């Protein structure tokens, strides 16, 4: 019995020494690694033109789709804003070609990119607040920090992977419709959003439902992408979507950012798992 107790005491001493090393050394090594990765992610969002404080450079992306040539165009992205847009739309009924560009005095902020960048900045702030001079005293303290960092990273990723669901009246009321010159015809709606690593442009063609229409009017709810036949009320008119054209372009640095988010979340989880291993040995007391 004495031998068993001595072995148990020796094991406990070894575990406690390993745990102290984990708290004092490995945790800070992981935090430093996370900082480096997230700073790289943050640089992808800022895309400075000259020096870290310079304005974001402009990048041109050609819109395309394997399913339609009704819409073609080029979008110019500058950081978290669309600074220019050049769109050609071929009307299905008469093949009339419409051409629209952004007004020179306008830019369209992409809130998804702005929000994702802010969440990354918040995660970096949380990590910096626990620099190498900070001494973690308990595993629970590390878990709390990792949970807070993971929350910010998950929110950042979700902003890019989960576009907002909008109703057609919300799209119609959006300022994006008034960004173009010449002004968009009243039977067109435009929406722009981020989906994963892609910048998507959707054009909705509308037609008015006649007051004596026999169609059962059912307003469509919110959606990322509405389908032909979706109905809504705007002003005194009832309208229906007749055609939907979606084109997109890949933004390489958004893909980089998503990879950085995934790697960072994995590092956080691995550190949490290591801390939790020790808690199983000392489940009867705080660790």
UniProtKB/Swiss-Prot annotation:
- Please list the residues that carry the modification N-acetylalanine: 2
Q: Which compartments is it annotated to reside in?
A: Nucleus envelope; Presynapse; Cell projection, Axon; Perikaryon
Q: Which domain of life is it from?
A: Eukaryota
Q: What is this protein called?
A: Protein rogdi homolog
Q: Which example biological process does GO assign this protein?
A: neuromuscular process
Query: An example Gene Ontology cellular component term from the record?
Result: dendrite
InterPro entries assigned to the protein according to its UniProt record, in alphabetical order:
RAVE2/Rogdi (IPR028241)
One Pfam family in the UniProt entry:
Rogdi_lz
**Sorted UniProt keywords:** Acetylation, Cell projection, Cytoplasmic vesicle, Nucleus, Synapse
Q: How does it assemble?
A: Monomer.
> What family is reported?
Belongs to the rogdi family.
Coiled-coil parts of chain: none
Residues annotated as transmembrane: none
């Amino acid at each position: 019995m004495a031998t068993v107790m001595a072995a148990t005491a020796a094991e406990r001493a070894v575990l406690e020494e390993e745990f102290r090393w984990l708290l004092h050394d490995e945790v800070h090594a992981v935090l430093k690694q996370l900082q480096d990765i997230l700073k790289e992610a943050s640089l992808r969002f800022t895309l400075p033109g000259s020096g870290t404080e310079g304005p974001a450079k402009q990048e041109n992306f050609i819109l395309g789709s394997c399913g339609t040539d009704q819409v073609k165009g080029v979008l110019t992205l500058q950081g978290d804003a669309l600074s220019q847009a050049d769109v050609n739309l071929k009307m299905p009924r008469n093949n009339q070609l419409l051409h629209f560009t952004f007004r020179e005095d306008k830019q369209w902020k992409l809130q998804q990119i702005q929000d994702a960048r802010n969440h990354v900045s918040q995660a970096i702030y949380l990590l910096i607040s626990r620099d190498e001079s900070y001494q973690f005293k308990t595993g629970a303290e590390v878990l709390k920090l990792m949970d807070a960092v993971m929350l910010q990273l998950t929110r950042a990723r979700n902003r890019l992977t989960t576009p907002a669901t909008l109703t057609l009246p919300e799209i119609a009321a959006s300022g994006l419709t008034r960004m173009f010159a010449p002004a968009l015809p009243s039977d067109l709606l435009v929406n722009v959003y981020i989906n994963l690593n892609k910048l998507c442009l959707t054009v909705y063609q509308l037609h008015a439902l006649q007051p004596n229409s026999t169609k059962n009017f059912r307003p469509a709810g919110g959606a990322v992408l509405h389908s032909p036949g979706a109905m809504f009320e705007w002003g005194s008119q009832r309208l229906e979507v007749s055609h939907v054209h979606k084109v997109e372009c890949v933004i390489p640095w958004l893909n980089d950012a998503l990879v950085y988010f995934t790697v960072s979340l994995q590092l956080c989880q691995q550190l949490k798992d290591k801390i939790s291993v020790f808690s199983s040995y000392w489940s009867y007391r705080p660790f």
